[in-house]
């Protein structure tokens, strides 16, 4: 059984409603702070962009029963936004009575993000009983701790079975080059549009890198596993790249936006997690753009990861242990 009540005492509440990669990365940061300050962790993934039902907490839908992560007690609630919270809470906006909160402006969200980042990096404990994290907290967790956090997660049985099925059919006996291409399909998240000023040139850059990596395995069967949010990108690579495969998914129409949408229901979140897990099993991972949160978890597990450096115009091999990257 999941702990489904807000705990008494000190806690960190991670409330996210965005794409799965952002939800997980931000949750890892909240967990890290909870562990450092010996607080409990509360997960609120209700009102998710993947579901039309605001009461469904997405985390228990995707992951098996987890009541403890690395010594941190974990609890699950829904709709923190409608809870009357005690005065001992930060950021201060959450102290307002529910009827006065309304919708937070972007400026308010960015202020909260900066406040929480400063708190997390300072490694000091807050005086407040509850710390509410309702903003993007990417890059706010030590990478070794982040790996440890992901190691504790257990995806649900359906996802495990689907990943094992695709792995047996497509991965076994092959070198698999995973390619994650975040296009946006009409939306500009994290300023990704700047990577797509010349769309055909961008896709050719990725294709060139795929061929370059393929040549490194002259005596092995190689396959390309593609994850993208764009029907145009999918069509282009299926046409240009022999040996490419992808999981079956429905795209939104061109220009209508990304895949994390209530249009696809909870099945969209499940499909995203399947793709995420399969990327983690690849021998090589190519990311364009590299800042997408979706492929963050896989990028910490795959041995050879190549991220595109827009300033230099080349793919660089990630070298996170050394704190840098080399072109390759």
Swiss-Prot record:
Enzyme Commission code: 2.4.1.-
Any one Gene Ontology BP term: oligosaccharide biosynthetic process
Highest taxon, organism lineage: Bacteria
Ranges of residues in domain GT23: 6-317
Coiled coil: none
Single GO MF descriptor: hexosyltransferase activity
Covalent S-S links between cysteines: none
InterPro entries, per the entry: GT23_dom (IPR027350), NodZ (IPR008716)
CDD domains referenced in this protein's UniProt entry, alphabetically: NodZ_like
Purpose of the protein: Fucosyltransferase which adds the fucose moiety of the nod factor on its terminal reducing N-acetylglucosamine end. Uses GDP-fucose as the donor group.
Family in the record: Belongs to the glycosyltransferase 23 family.
Name by which UniProt lists this protein: Nodulation protein Z
Organism: Azorhizobium caulinodans (strain ATCC 43989 / DSM 5975 / JCM 20966 / LMG 6465 / NBRC 14845 / NCIMB 13405 / ORS 571)
Biological classification of the source: Bacteria, Pseudomonadati, Pseudomonadota, Alphaproteobacteria, Hyphomicrobiales
